[in-house]
Every structure is written in structure tokens, then in C-alpha cells.
Amino acid sequence: MLSVIEKVNDVVNNFIWGVPAMICIIGVGLLLSFRTGFIQIRKFPYAMKVTLGRMLKKREASDGALTPFQAVCTALAATVGTGNVAGVAGAIAIGGPGAVFWMWISALLGMCTKFSEVTLAVHFHERNANGDLVGGPMYYIKNGLKKHWHWLAYLFSAFGVLTVFGTGNATQVNTITTAIDSALYNYDIISKESASTFNLIIGIVLAALIALILLGGIKRIGQVTEKLVPFMAVMYILLALGVVIINLKAIPGVFGAIIEGAFNPSAVTGGAVGSFFMSMKKGVSRGIFSNEAGLGTGSIAHACADTKKPVKQGFFGIFEVFVDTIVICTLTALVILCSGVSVGYGEAAGAELTISGFTSTYGGWVSIFTAVAMCCFAFSTIIGWGLYGTRCIEFLFGTKANKPFMVVYSLVAIVGATMNLGLMWSIAETFNGLMVIPNLIAVFLLSGVVVKLVKEYLAGEGAASTLKNSREEAKRTFL
């Protein structure tokens, strides 16, 4: 039975994360870029000003809402995960250094896609029965499109619930236990025989922490992520920058390999990666999977932002993709490529390749810091996806389902800490990809609303849009 499930999942997974899906995601990104006048490039300095500038300002959000900074930290908590460490390594190993170039291209278009998703999520958000601000793809489908499109909202939510237990929880907990075990093995603190009991204890502790944070509501989630995300991002960036600075002489050659490898991978990898298409596919898919542009999930967190300016919050979407892919993923790639570690091109690789880049530069002691970074990345992802799952289950069954879901979601951490999750990861990845379909359809149909809101905002330099009139116009105009 399991073998049948695995085969069916492989077929669906290869299609969802294959060429047709990537063409759709890139195509929608191009459409939005053209329709907004490539706002992610044209207004990039302004985007950094209104995002980084606002982060330094302390402010309080209304009840049931987050500050704009807490919203972007919650979105980044889910986005910046172990994939930034393991996924980039895998892309380079299979697609060669040129995969990094295509990762940048996907991020460039993804900035506009996520900008549009966030803008729509804030524009169409609403208060739920508990008084919390809620939004995301299911809400901009419900509030922005006519009734015959509303099935897409339920489809997105159903796929979201099925995804969170694997992608957002169990596999992340498994990463935490693996990272801790590996670090402690090096210092003979635990043995491989005692690891299973130790992992069970970790799972129970994590389950308690997850429940404590999620059951505390949106305010507590925001308070945790606004402290955890900057800490983990700065720690990882500083460690990676150290590797780059120590190996500075290698950087020109690395960038040369990235550019040449993007169009002639066999010349850089000695024939191990002979396909231009493979390099492009791995880079684009890694970029999409890392920054989640096109999935719509990040907009769920941004919809909680207490703001009346959807476009202004949308600029946080540009900032989010920039930090996740252009900064963190690029630094991971540089750690691997400039440190001199041996890359087995054409063979699968993961976090161990990135960790080798750090240890070859700093020495074995850095394994403790990389373990801490991996744990922070994974735990923040668990919290971010916990919010996404709560919003999806709430859309399907109402607010009464929130607390039972949070309890079950927390307990799944124990499963993740103690079991082999190979098939679960693959199935969760498939459902994750299935979330793209209803979201991209909605973003495509509502692209005119994004253009209108952008024109209003830029014309008034931040004047708030008239919510009621825009919503009614959207429903009259877009199918």
C-alpha cells in the first residue's frame, strides 16, 4: 500500500514541481511585473525605505492584529527555514553553480508576485469572530472574486491543512533533532543508542513550546517571531559573511562560475551537469520553494498587519523575497562555492554540504553554532506554519476549530522527533505545490486590482485606498 502511495505521489509531485508549474509561476510573475511597471525594480530603493525604516519604529497594533514588522517577521519565520541551508546545497549539487543565477532570476520575478499577494491579502482582510484580523488567498478569493470562484478558497485551505503537519511541523522537528544529535555526537555527550530517548524528550519539550506560543494567540506569535527571526538571520548572515571574507580571493572566480554555469554548466562541473535546462530547473524551483512566492502562504501572516495601506505592506513582500533568496540563499551558495569543499556534482546533497563549508573554514567548533542556526530556522518555520494552518482550518470550519487544531499540531512534534519521515516529507511537498494552483488563478484574475491599488498609492504617496469601492469594483470587473 505504501509503495502505491509513494508511486502516485511521485507522479503528482514531478508534475506540480515540474516544468508546467514553473512556467505558470514565472509567467504570472512576468505578467504582474509588466502590469506594475516592474515595481520591484523601479521602486526597490523606496521598498527598502518603507520596510527597513518602519522596522526601527516602535508601535502597537490593535487587538487581534500584528504590527507591520511583526507580520513580516512571522512570514519570514515560515519562509526562512532549513531549505535555505539544505535546499541551496541540493540545487548546486544537481544543477551546478549556474543554478544560483536562475535562483536570482526567480527571486526577481517572485518579488512582484509576493508583493501582489501581500497587497491583495491586506486589501481583502477582515475580522473573524474572535476579533482577529484574518486574510490570505482564501479571503482574497472570497472577497475579491465572484461566487463561482469561491471553491478555489476551500481548495487552497484544504491543501494548506494537509501541508502544515508535514512541511511545517514534523519534518522541521526531525531537522532539529538531527542537528542537535549531530552536534552532541561530536562531543560524546550522547551515544547513538540513547538518541531515541533523547529525541523523544526533545519532541515533548517542543510540543509544549509550540502549544504555549500558538494558544497564546496572534499577539504572542508576533512577540516571539519579532525576536527570533532577527536573531537567527543576523547570526547566520554573520557566520556566512565570515566565510566569504576569509575566502575573499575566491569570490571573483565563484561569480564567474555562477554566470558561466548558468548557460554552460558542463564547462564548470567537468561534464557532471551537462544540461542547461537542469541548471535552470533546479535554480528556479529552489528559488520558488525557498521564498514561497506563488504559494500565497506568506500573505496569510501579512494579512494580520494593522494597516490601512495594502500597497505599503506589499513592499514588505519585496523585502521578504530579497532577504530570503538574494541575501540568505546567496550567502549559503557562497559558503559552499568559495570555501573549497568538494561538491559531488550530479549527486544529491543537503545541509551537510553547507555545514562542511563552515567547518572547513572555521573548524569543528562551529558545528554548535550551525546546529543552533538550524534549530532556530526549523522552530521559526513551525510557528509560522502553525499560524497558516490555523487560518486554513478556521476558514473551513470556523474559529471553534482553532484550539483543537493547535493542540493536534503541537503533538505532531513528538511524531516528527521519533520517526523516519521520508514519505511524509514528499507528500507534504506535493500538497505544498498544490496550493500554488488556486492561488495563482486568483492572483492572475485580481491583477487588475493590484494595478489599481498601486496607481492610487503612488499617486497619493501613501494615501489609503477606499476599501469598499475597490472591493465592489473588483467583483463587477473580474469575472
Give, region by region, the residue ranges found by the protein language model.
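N-terminal alpha-helical transmembrane segments of multi-pass membrane transport
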Residues: 1-82, 92-99, 110, 245, ...
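Alpha-helical membrane segments and immediately flanking helix-loop junctions
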Residues: 59-94, 120-143, 155-161, 273-322
